[in-house]
């Protein structure tokens, strides 16, 4: 089993897709990359903690290759916009990848190279060593499954799920 910690805008979006990905055993929404210990959602949203909203995706690489997890990540958000995803603006929404080993760092850099071929603008994804990971509050875990009819889910997450189904259907469970 491997765990990648990835930030691509609001963590609810990545969580929704990875929850439906074959071989993924756990998706935990959280915060990392900042300077405040044990931040909460409101502190992170204030933009003063330096943290990014991220998901820790644990998966069986014999079922779903690392490259698929990473390529999905780059397909599901815009890695060329600095500190924003659509209407979500702030450093907490930055495109980011947090590694724990040199091997992961290399995998992340290779994924950026693959993704750059798909984008005309330069990719600005931050690649950093994982500092402390802070699990987000329970309401943010598996958010889409809890609140599928909430406005954000309908307008923002549903199109990302549709895109994942279009390009990664072989890797999705439903």
Curated annotation (Swiss-Prot):
It holds the Pfam family PMSR. The active site is at 10. GO terms for biological process: protein modification process. The keyword Secreted does not apply. InterPro entries: Met_Sox_Rdtase_MsrA_dom, Met_Sox_Rdtase_MsrA_sf. It catalyses: L-methionyl-[protein] + [thioredoxin]-disulfide + H2O = L-methionyl-(S)-S-oxide-[protein] + [thioredoxin]-dithiol; [thioredoxin]-disulfide + L-methionine + H2O = L-methionine (S)-S-oxide + [thioredoxin]-dithiol. Keywords: Oxidoreductase. It is an enzyme of class 1 (oxidoreductase). One of its GO terms (molecular function) is L-methionine:thioredoxin-disulfide S-oxidoreductase activity. Its EC number is 1.8.4.11. The keyword Oxidoreductase applies. Belongs to the MsrA Met sulfoxide reductase family. Has an important function as a repair enzyme for proteins that have been inactivated by oxidation. Catalyzes the reversible oxidation-reduction of methionine sulfoxide in proteins to methionine. This is Peptide methionine sulfoxide reductase MsrA. It comes from Paenarthrobacter aurescens (strain TC1).
